[in-house]
């Protein structure tokens, strides 16, 4: 496909897919009456690679290896190698257990539900969301803070099973092979160590209600959701083979662990370590069932979660990688927003490190990166549609610190830069 360029005797060739001219791209590949540019070829390769990675879940035996699952998680989640391995092995074994159950073997394989423990902003929820994209079984996420005991205002525990059923398009057989991720599980901890005469309907009561569906029971689920009533028809869902993954920040758990460690380290030969010098993730690695019980989880609930994986604090280097490397990295997102106005956006290396330092100081982990970026670029994005002749916006460390405005580079002044 060719178009004559106005004022030019030679014909200019254009990409048949994106419409860019041969002068706007590095290469233009010709075919019979059509052309494709190098940028479109790259985009097609990305799509093919992504589909190839996701295709592993439909292999001939239907069991992806833990390494394959980890490789896909690596594309979206930076660091947390131990937690990735725990999840990958759990999902791999979940597939194997389902295949094993269909063969009517004498040995019954029990499921190993997982508890993810880690500071806020370390990637617990993102790991679960990424798993949902790559696995070939129904997957749903639930928020523990919305759950209450049956009969009280709030969501019934059985609504989790309903969400899984909806994810399986109401195919009961598929739903019974699914995976459930319950977020903010630490928010349903018992309010105090001592039994109370008042009912704890959103804490211990929810833990009691979750016990049965996590271990395995036949749940009666109303097809349309909501509260049950006698005239209603119910769908029967067996939760025995549903894998449950629970995650929470468990703020304050590190103090319980440190206190236990301090009690053991008494005497002249004891090694004295200042708790302030140890990072939260490092302390959480030493978590034991007794610590979780002191935090407020009941022993029966802890027993239903035999696998405990802890996530590490994210250091400066990891936060810089999170800003730039994942497919949906924050820097890439803002660059795309600026591209829509035909303006480039560049963050200098020192600016990225300064953003990471700010997030560490706020103790918000990766979750705090977006709000910091938003604050830095707010004024620039407000004026962005009105900029004329601006080719690029550059953010350096001084801008992040609030001591300067982003630098504006104008098309006619490529050698110089003017302050916004």
Swiss-Prot record:
Disruption phenotype: Essential, it cannot be deleted. When depleted for ClpX cells arrest before the initiation of chromosome replication and are blocked in the cell division process. In depletion experiments ClpX protein starts to decline after about 4 hours, which coincides with cell filamention and a 1000-fold loss of viability by 12 hours; SocB protein accumulates. Deletion of socB permits slower than wild-type growth of the clpX disruption.
Region Required for interaction of SocA with this protein and degradation of SocB by ClpXP, annotated ranges: 1-62
Keywords of this entry: ATP-binding, Chaperone, Metal-binding, Nucleotide-binding, Zinc
Binding site for ATP: 119-126
SMART domains (UniProt xref): AAA, ClpB_D2-small, zf-C4_ClpX
Domain ClpX-type ZB: 3-56
Domain of life: Bacteria
Gene3D superfamilies: 1.10.8.60, ClpX chaperone, C4-type zinc finger domain, P-loop containing nucleotide triphosphate hydrolases
MF annotations from Gene Ontology: ATP binding; ATP hydrolysis activity; ATP-dependent protein folding chaperone; protein dimerization activity; unfolded protein binding; zinc ion binding
GO BP term, pick one: proteolysis involved in protein catabolic process
Pfam families: AAA_2 (PF07724), ClpB_D2-small (PF10431), zf-C4_ClpX (PF06689)
Residues involved in Zn(2+) binding: 15, 18, 37, 40
GO cellular component: HslUV protease complex
Subunit description: Component of the ClpX-ClpP complex. Forms a hexameric ring that, in the presence of ATP, binds to fourteen ClpP subunits assembled into a disk-like structure with a central cavity, resembling the structure of eukaryotic proteasomes. Interacts with SocA.
Family annotation (PANTHER family): ATP-DEPENDENT CLP PROTEASE ATP-BINDING SUBUNIT CLPX-LIKE, MITOCHONDRIAL (PTHR48102:SF7), ATP-DEPENDENT CLP PROTEASE ATP-BINDING SUBUNIT CLPX-LIKE, MITOCHONDRIAL-RELATED (PTHR48102)
Domain notes: The N-terminal domain (residues 1-62) is required for interaction with SocA and targeting of SocB for degradation by ClpXP.
Record HAMAP family: ClpX
UniProt record similarity statement: Belongs to the ClpX chaperone family.
Role noted for this protein: ATP-dependent specificity component of the Clp protease. It directs the protease to specific substrates. Required for degradation of response regulator CtrA, thus contributing to the G1-to-S transition. Required to degrade DNA replication inhibitor toxin SocB, this function is probably the reason why the protease is essential in this organism. Can perform chaperone functions in the absence of ClpP.
The protein's name: ATP-dependent Clp protease ATP-binding subunit ClpX
Organism: Caulobacter vibrioides (strain NA1000 / CB15N) (Caulobacter crescentus)
Gene name of the record: clpX
